[in-house]
Regions:
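Conserved hydrophobic packing residues within short motifs/helices of P-loop NTPase cores
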Residues: 22-24, 45
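Extreme N-terminal leader/targeting segments of oxidoreductases
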Residues: 1-21, 36-40
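Helix-loop-beta segment of a Rossmann-like dinucleotide-binding subdomain
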Residues: 125-135, 145-178
Length: 178
């Protein structure tokens, strides 16, 4: 009963105010949009049917990535924007977002050839020219196996190693943005 009264009081307060921006959904994206609007001087209302970061954000991969897979579809603008946002999060939330190294094994006869993987890695590095993270590395089969001894050696040509970001607690990052 008390919660219903509090909700009623809250709704009455909201109805008496004017907002420049109403964001529906208090996950990581909604909170980020609300933060951006508030930083631009807008009067922002952030709404959600549940708790902050209780939906998709809570069950995400926790990756703060630049969209490497979008290079395959020539979405260069999207990749560049994602890389800028990754860099921004690494800078403003180092207590929550940290570098994470990835390895892409390359096998003979795979859909993506070693040359295509290398081209993608170079493009990813060039689109993130202002990054604080290390550039990619192309590894030999021996170097790859030393890093990941569990990989199948059959047809292993090597690997591409690159760094993206990972958020430890996406819910906390969301709350800090809200």
């Amino acid at each position: 009963m008390a919660a219903e009264l509090a909700r009623g009081d809250l709704m009455a307060t909201i109805e008496r105010q004017r907002f420049d921006l109403i964001v529906i959904g208090a996950g990581i994206n909604g909170a980020g949009i609300a933060r951006d609007g508030a930083m631009r001087g807008l009067r922002v209302l952030l709404l959600d049917k549940d708790d902050i970061a209780a939906g998709t954000t809570a069950f995400s991969t926790r990756l703060i990535h630049g969209g490497l897979r979008y290079l395959e579809y020539a979405e260069f603008g999207l990749v560049r924007e994602s890389l800028r946002e990754r860099e921004r999060l690494l800078r403003i939330a180092p207590h929550l977002v940290s570098p994470h190294r990835f390895l892409i094994p390359i096998y003979a006869g795979a859909r993506r050839s070693p040359a295509l993987i290398r081209l993608g890695m170079v493009a990813y590095d060039l689109l993130s020219f202002d990054k604080s993270l290390p550039w990619h590395q192309m590894l030999s089969p021996e170097e790859t196996h030393a890093l990941e001894p569990g990989l199948d050696d059959g047809g292993l040509c090597g690997a591409a190693a690159y760094t993206d970001g990972q958020v430890t607690f996406p819910e906390r990052l969301t709350v800090e943005n809200a």
